[in-house]
Amino acid sequence: MNACHGRDRKILGRVIAAVLVLGSLARGLDAAPPLPLAAGLAAAEAARAMTAPPGFSVKLLAAEPEVCQPIAMCFDDRGRLWVVECYAYPHKLPAAEARDRILIFEDTDGDHVLDSRKVFAEGLNLASGIAVGFGGVWVGAAPELLFFPDADADDVPDGPPRILLDGWGAEDTHETLNSFIWGPDGWLYGCHGVFTHSAVGKPGTPESDRVRINAGIWRYHPVRHEFEVFSEGTSNPWGVDFNDLGHAFQTACVIPHLYHVIPGGRYQRQAGQHFNPSTFDDIKTIARHRHWAGDRWNDADQAASDAIGGGHAHSGACIYLGGAWPEHHRGKLFMNNIHGARLNEDRLTPAGSGYVGDGEPDFLFANDSWSQFISLQVGPDGQMVLIDWYDQTQCHQQRDAVDRSNGRIFKVVYENAATVSVHLGGKSDGELVAL
């Protein structure tokens, strides 16, 4: 999530004239909509302030005090939303002060409001990732990957969490294990940033036998309990997703923003060297465009960057594969642009043995400089859910720079579609295949 390395930027205004001039440039935009001049909006007001395409609306699912500091989320087989609250960020706390939590939300009456809320676990420290499956809940909280068993699915842990892996670094807490997602192969995938150095293994693993990672994507097999680095490189990724062919795509910050990721691939790095010193070269971005102007990001570039995507920092990666939105969005990758306070949309086109990525018009504008969508996922109803960290500061090097009093969950809905009720765990293999 760290996008500016120590600069506490507060975007309190925009150079509107420059935006209007530049709005016709890059990716065929007629004009950039009003940019985030608002700041510190109440939750319902923030939802109303957003600009979505025709036919779409933004629903407020939940907000403070029901949820604060949302840093990760996932859906379970009943369509419920699990959210990690990280109060420790950006610095790990003494154990006695740890109070990060895992919440379970549900919309029980289909009105696009999360009216049911449970606390599944609390007392976590620097929690940053979550996935539900295989009889429990998988949680990243450096230096550990944890598993909370809940075999009877009663929303109460069957016992204390098991430490599956340890050795996850926290030198830069913006860049530890994050963005958990189940891959089409059944492995649990996650991201890891370049300025945090991890030596991962099962508890008690000798230092010489541990797996090193400092930038890239890792994966863990939930049955065989195997851990490996899937790909190396990029910068501080907070988003990975798979298309309908099972191909992986990753977003990044500071360096070019989009990568088609293959097993064993070594990709452009923001800093440092690849572990193999004999690496001749690394794989570059598939993007044929940028979301920011200038050769090196600085505040002066903001007006120009607003016209072409908003900035160099991205969080989240969501390839739309639902059936509720217009067909032209299907298969495209959405990501949050942190400085631009908007969702970028990229088109992925097969090219040779890989892909190229081209920019579509920006999909959604928060019009609020405090908005920071950390994760975006498609729910069981085919609509997109966003968790919003919501803070005036986008870089959190100092502990007291973080506003821990708020957080929001939104849903982007097409044509006011109804919600759906699911319970995949109660279906047979044949019924699941039919879906």
For the regions a language model picked out, list residue spans one by one.
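N-terminal secretory signal peptides that target proteins for export/translocation
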Residues: M1-I11
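Intrinsic-disorder-associated interaction segments
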Residues: H5, V15-A18, G425
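Beta-propeller domains with acidic blade repeats across secreted/periplasmic ectodomains
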Residues: G28-L435
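Bacterial N-terminal signal peptides
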Residues: R14-R27
